[in-house]
C-alpha cells in the first residue's frame, strides 16, 4: 500500500477519476511482475512468470501505446510482429496485468482509510481462509439446511464493464478494458471459467468477477437486513463488505417497492451467506419449503435483474445432517454426537441420552488423490509413482520439494476431524520421493531406504509435532491428543494448487 502512495503523482481529489495515465508508467508493470512472482512461489513449480516482464519489453509496449494509432492491434495482423519480435498476445497479457494493478488502487486506498478510521486490530488474521471454519463450528451446528449455489457467469463481456462503471469514473480506462476483453477473449472462452483465466490475467479476472458479484450480493444483503438487524462486525474489514453496506441506503429506495410484498418469505435471523471461488453457500434454520423458495429467488434474480442464464439445477438443497458440503478443500457436514449421561438421585439412577450436533470437517481424499495423480505423484488408484521430471535435480532439492508440498498440505488440512486421510497423503508423497531418488540413482526402493535410514522419514512425520511443541511446550509432551485435534491457522491466505482441484 505504501508503494501505491509513493508512486501516485496525481492530485488527491482527482485520483479516482484519472487512472488511464498510469498505464504508461513502468513501475505499474513492475508491481504486476512482483505480484505474479510471489504468487507463483506458492504453487508447486515456478512457471517462468518473470521471463515475460523484462524492462525492454515493457518500454517497447509503452512506446507502442504512446504512439498515435498504434494502440489498436488489428486482429488481421500476424501474431508475430517483425519489428518488436514478440507475440501480440504477450502485450495483451502485460496490459491486462498492469490494468489489474491500476484498477485496484482506489479500492486499496479506500480499504486503508476504512481500517485506519475504524481502528480494526489484527485485520490480517481475518483474511485467513481458516478463519471462517471457527465461525462454521459455532453456527452450522444449529442450522438445518444449506443451499449449495453454483454462481453463473455473465453471458456478455459488457456486463462486467458496466458493473465497474459505478466505481471507476475514468472513461479511458474503461475503454481500454473493453478493448482488451473484446480483442483477446471470445465469447466461448469466457463462458468456460478455466479457459478464460488462462487467457486473461487471473488477477484482473477475479477483480471483475468480484465486482460483478458485489452487485447482486448487495440486493441479497438488503433483504437480509430487512429481515434481521444483526450485523457481523468481523466482516467489516473486507473490501467487498464495505461497498455492500454503503449501498444499503440506495437499495432501500430502489428495491423496496419491488420486494416489499415478498419480504415475509425471508423472515429468518439465522441466515448465513458465504461466497467462495465460483460457489456460494446459504445456510439457514428454515424448513425445506422455505429453502426451496430461496432457491428460485436466486434463479429469478440472476435471470431478470442481471441477465445471467441460470437453471434451478445450479442451486441444490442439502440437509446438513445427511449431506456434506465441498467447501474450501474440506467436506463439511453436521454430525450427530450421541452421549449417555447417568444421573444418580438418592436411591434412583437415570440414564439420559443426549445427542449434540457437531461440525465435521473431513479431507476429500478421492479428489485429492485425483489431484496428486494429475501432478504425477501417484496413479489413479493412489499408488505412489516416481516423478521423472524432478530426477535431474539434486537429492537435497528433490527432498526439499516433496517436504515442502507435504508441509503445505498438512498445514492446510490441519483442521480435519480424521487424520487417517492426511496420513495416506503423506504416505503417497513420501514414497513418491523415495521412488524418484531411486530412479535417479538407478537403485531399488528397498536399497535406497536402507541408505537413508530413519532420518528421511522423520522429515515427513515430525513437522507438525515440532510446530506444536513450539506453540504449546507444556501441554504437548503431556498429551498427544492435541496433535490429533483440529488446528486452524490464521496465516493461510490462498489455497494450494493440489487442494484447489475444482
From Swiss-Prot:
Location in the cell: Plastid, Chloroplast
InterPro entries named in the record: Domain_X, Maturase_MatK, Maturase_MatK_N
GO biological process: mRNA processing; RNA splicing; tRNA processing
One CC-aspect GO term: chloroplast
Disulfide bond positions: none
Transmembrane segments: none
GO function terms (MF aspect): RNA binding
Entry keywords, A to Z: Chloroplast, mRNA processing, Plastid, RNA-binding, tRNA processing
Main localization, broad class: plastid
Pfam families per UniProt: Intron_maturas2, MatK_N
Domain of life: Eukaryota
Protein purpose: Usually encoded in the trnK tRNA gene intron. Probably assists in splicing its own and other chloroplast group II introns.
Family, similarity comment: Belongs to the intron maturase 2 family. MatK subfamily.
Name of protein: Maturase K
Organism: Fremontodendron californicum (California flannelbush)
Gene name per UniProt: matK
